[in-house]
Amino acid sequence: MGRVEGKVAFITGAARGQGRSHAVRLAQEGADIIAVDVCRQVDTVPYPTATSEDLAETVRQVEALDRRIVATEADVRDLGALTKAVDDGVGQLGRLDIVLANAGISTPAPTLEMDEETWSTMIDVNLTGVWKTVRAAVPHIVDGGRGGSVVITSSLAAQKANANTAHYTAAKAGLVGLMKVLALELAPQNIRVNTIHPTTVATDMILNEPTYRLFRPDVEHPTRADFEEAALTLNKMPVPALEAVDISNAVLYLVSDDGRYVTGTTHTVDAGGNL
């Protein structure tokens, strides 16, 4: 029997990267999935964002594990669309136990040079979008009366400053405060809330030239190899970037009975990056 057998998880940013990895990992352990992603380009983001084809591939991989999945294209900035997506998913799958507020963007820029749209979009997606996710989804867990778990994807950036990431850092640090209040408010309903704080992870959000330039401003056209050389100095263990499944395994611990009394914590998976 899987560690989340028979449970249903709502996952944002599920079309690729960590979100897809979480969906597949939980499906491997017996969960059914409600998946959402924006599936269109976000104007301020300098790398290609997820597509409809990406979300369809997540569906294919979950269904290949003989688990059910309800997938919807929705923007975490749109509370109405999120609410409809989760309502439809619960209507088809019958319950909700787990919420993974994973959707996020990265738009590196110097603090005093970024424009207002870059700042606002970051906060709208990476901070307010998480509040909208839990606002849309967690009432279903409360109504179920079985307890449950919420995991919010923060970042090592919430714990350790990096230049050119003020908006990202502000959003990810804000998630810690949101998590702690939610953990306090939801504990009587046996709903646990935690943040997870990855270091660099080898996904499309990291593996792109704007991020390479963030790590290697000394190189005119940095490559992945240039990025990895710099990233090795961030993590104390000899690895430039983790794999998405490394984060998914930590998420699985937090949402399963293995973590049944873990709430209100900042769960770091950083290869020693914060040491």
Task: Enumerate the predicted regions with their spans.
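Canonical Rossmann dinucleotide-binding motif of NAD(H)/NADP(H)-dependent dehydrogenases/reductases
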Residues: 2-38
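Residue(s) in the substrate-gating loop at a strand-loop-helix junction
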Residues: 155
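Short, small/polar-rich loop/turn modules that mediate ligand/substrate recognition or access, typified
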Residues: 187, 192, 262-264
